[in-house]
Amino acid sequence: MSTTTPTHIPFRLVRKGVVMSPLPGESTEVEGVLNPASGRTPDGRLHLLPRLVADGNVSRVGLAEVTFTDGVPSGVERRGVVLAPDEGWERGKNNAGVEDPRVTWVPSLGKHVMSYVAYGPLGPKPALAVSENLTDWTRLGPIQFAYQPDLDTDLNLFPNKDVVHFPEPVPGPDGEMAYAMLHRPMWDLGWFRPGEGVHLPAGVTDERPGIWISYVPVAEVEQDIRALTRPRQHRLVALSEYPWESLKIGGGPAPIRVDEGWLLIHHGVSGSIEDPFAQNQKVSYAAGAMILDPADPSQVIARSDQPLMAPETDEERSGTVPNVVFPTAIEEVDGKLYVFYGMADAHIGVALLERTS
């Protein structure tokens, strides 16, 4: 990436309000509802899959049907919990969680593909599950990144978050059509082994976490859906470039196809982080966008140099983690695109994605 990349992104985000807040007296939500995935059930009804945080920062994935006022998402009706940290690898001695789901409907597979962060014995690890109806999920297991000698490291050593799949096959580095996923490795192993510090892959000189892409050939997934957990051909897509994202960046909702290419809404973080796994941070999370080349989605062809949305409202500026706008889902409703986002790790908001030119 270079700052010579065009910075014009012909879209803007317009706030439409809060759609979900913690339900008083609900034990699974006492520390917040946030960072939702989304999808439609077979009958076409729109649902969110919010991260529900119980006491002790234990997260589950819920299901909530979206309600509307004058055609605009305005609330939800809860439908229960659809994924909990029930597996041993999703729980540690003093922690547990299935966190920050992203869900992509993949028509060629006839399935919703959920990525989530399993907060287990060795910290955060990405994992996958699939469903045909948003209610019944089948775990595919933790993601196992294929060894790539030219990186001079094993991606499985590192915490990894913000995994999200493209909704259709894209060209891989070898020209073969593949199911691709974006992800965000974090190179500092000091959280696991004090003093170990940062271990960068070969060719990477910036230790700030950025967005990567990995691929699985279509033929392998058609033979066995579990192949999605074994991505390879890892490539760096983007690193922090601008002041509003000076600490790190990460992918948001599944990329959507627009005239210019693949539109990726992402988050950027500025401020200071003393403990990467502490809830209270002196940081600001904002939403931006980039456009990826449809012929090679590892290439960024345009990128916003200013955030499309930064924390401004009370709900975005005050919460479990203050000053957070964290986009994680995007859906079309009556020809309009709405982005759902976490607000200060406490509430869920919605914004209209509008074309500006």
Each model region followed by its residue ranges:
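Beta-rich carbohydrate-recognition and catalytic domains
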Residues: 1-31, 35, 39-96, 105-160, ...
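Beta-rich, blade/repeat-based domains predominating
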Residues: 164-168, 252-254, 327-332
